[in-house]
């Protein structure tokens, strides 16, 4: 038997990385559907930005997903302010400068995984007691890079595959508690993070130009947010946008070896990767930099 539709009216939703990009768009969408939102972000300006979204139904908390204590404090603030917490959306994420693995410093790999993997687990862990008590929902923001070849951005792809596995495991662990787990997979989303990490990098643009055009279709943060909200209302297990990625995910066991073989023989792709090999090592943004540009936290 399928679960009943989930009415977002008056539900309290905590969103990490909610100051820009997908997080901010999701907050706006959920507010329009009657929810109360709690934005948890590393940016010190978060409380004021939350008030700008809605003076009554939005709350901002300064939190770093790498620090469990700050997330626990954000959950406590949410409950103190709104009296409950129904949904947690682990949206905060980090995208490093494109590079081959051998040209990526170990510190940069660790920084990416600290936010995109450990930070997601920290977020869920902090919120779970409240979410279980409300038989609510957990939302994890993965990416099509969970199943698409991650050449040139291996740490990011690794992290999103890990988020997918987190979602699968949580879905079973929380089944007896009446909690739903939604994993969202997005391709290129038109955010500041993608502008900096993709559009402003000519080598990355050249690499993308060698891929099938269907893979390059973009969506807006609002489209991603609508997918999340729709998924919550139906207690969906997964949301994939654009929709064309659904069959790719379902057929990944067949398609991935075929695509990997094609990519490994494509001279354009190999030449671009050689250029990534030869340029200066990648540098992951510092926490201060991500605070100044909050939309770098998350994505596709």
Residue ranges and their predicted role:
Residues 62-73, 106:
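The beta1-alpha1 cofactor-binding region of Rossmann-like NAD(H)/NADP(H)-dependent oxidoreductases
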Residues 124, 159-162:
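Active-site helix of classical SDR
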Residues 143:
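Residue(s) in the substrate-gating loop at a strand-loop-helix junction
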């Amino acid at each position: 038997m399928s679960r009943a539709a989930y009415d977002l009216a008056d539900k309290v939703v905590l969103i990490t990385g909610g100051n820009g990009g997908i997080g901010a768009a999701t907050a706006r969408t959920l507010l329009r559907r009657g929810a109360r939102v709690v934005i948890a972000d590393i940016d010190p300006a978060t409380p004021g930005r939350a008030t700008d979204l809605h003076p009554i139904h939005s709350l901002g908390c300064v939190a770093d997903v790498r620090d469990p204590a700050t997330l626990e404090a954000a959950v406590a603030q949410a409950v103190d302010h709104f009296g409950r917490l129904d949904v947690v959306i682990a949206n905060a994420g980090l995208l490093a400068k494109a590079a081959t693995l051998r040209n990526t410093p170990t510190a940069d790999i660790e920084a990416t995984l600290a936010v995109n993997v450990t930070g997601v687990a920290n977020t869920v862990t902090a919120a779970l007691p409240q979410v279980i008590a409300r038989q609510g929902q957990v939302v994890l923001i993965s990416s099509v890079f969970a199943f698409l070849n991650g050449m040139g951005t291996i740490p990011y792809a690794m992290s999103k595959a890990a988020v997918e596995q987190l979602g699968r495991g949580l879905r079973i662990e929380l089944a007896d508690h009446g909690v739903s787990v939604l994993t969202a997979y997005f391709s290129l989303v038109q955010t500041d993070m993608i502008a900096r990490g993709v559009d402003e990098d000519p080598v990355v643009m050249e690499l993308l130009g060698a891929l099938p055009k269907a893979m390059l279709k973009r969506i807006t943060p609002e489209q991603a947010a609508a997918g999340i909200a729709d998924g919550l209302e139906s207690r969906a297990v997964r949301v994939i946008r654009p929709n064309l990625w659904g069959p790719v995910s379902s057929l990944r066991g067949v398609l991935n070896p075929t695509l990997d073989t094609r990519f490994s023989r494509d001279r354009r792709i190999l030449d671009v990767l050689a250029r990534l090999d030869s340029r200066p090592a990648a540098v992951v943004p510092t926490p201060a930099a991500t605070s100044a540009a909050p939309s770098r936290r998350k994505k596709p």
